[in-house]
Amino acid sequence: KKLCEDINRLNNSEIACLLPSKEFCFIDTESISREYEHARLGTLTKSITNQCKYIIGGVEAILQKTIPKEVLLDNTLKISTGDNITLNELSKLLVNNGYVRAEKIEGYAQFSIRGDIVDIFPPNEENPVRIELWGEDIDTISYFDIDTQRRIDSIDCVTVPPAKESVFNKDFLLSKLKSLADTHSGDFQNYVIKDIQRLNSQLADIPTIDRYFSILYPNLDDTIFSYIDGFVCISEYDDCKNYAKNLWIQVAE
């Protein structure tokens, strides 16, 4: 983090972005923190939109599988003034991409709808955005302060990436889960059946979707390296190599 801050301070602009490691969740729990996942998505989005020249991360973050570049591109919304969209259509797209509807925006990955006004807080932005519609046409887009709820600056367009790394096609995932349920038994089978029921009940997401990360993204090359077309600099190579070796042992176990 300090290296990232130092680079940005020297250049007087945010050209370096931090990639934290993702906290995977494999068991049912009442609440799941997506803080680091949102930070990762923010960095990945800035990378594909050329807002970030350098990606800084630790060994674990760099080696972790992530949403493939083409999947991120396909599921990222670019909303511009003058675009035509219905509130129902926009709401459905946001929910499918992991956003949570709220009465008032309080943090990342939330959105709210009040009349013809839509507020969204994408993980790649420092401030939430307010979209005002005139009928089905987008009239204005602006940033607003999360505390005062007052508009700050007007913009012509905004990039809205998914709010989760696990983007999935419902029918595809249902098919894979049914196969898993048929070929397994015990607790794991019960977990899978419960997740199938969640999907069939029209729920937009599965809290423990991380269980199926390798099903959604089977390619072992789906890491941050698929986003990089330049050079890679490794600091303290031997330490990184040993840490990576131990990390793979833990993953295998």
Predicted regions and their residues:
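ASCE RecA-like P-loop NTPase motor cores
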Residues: 1-253
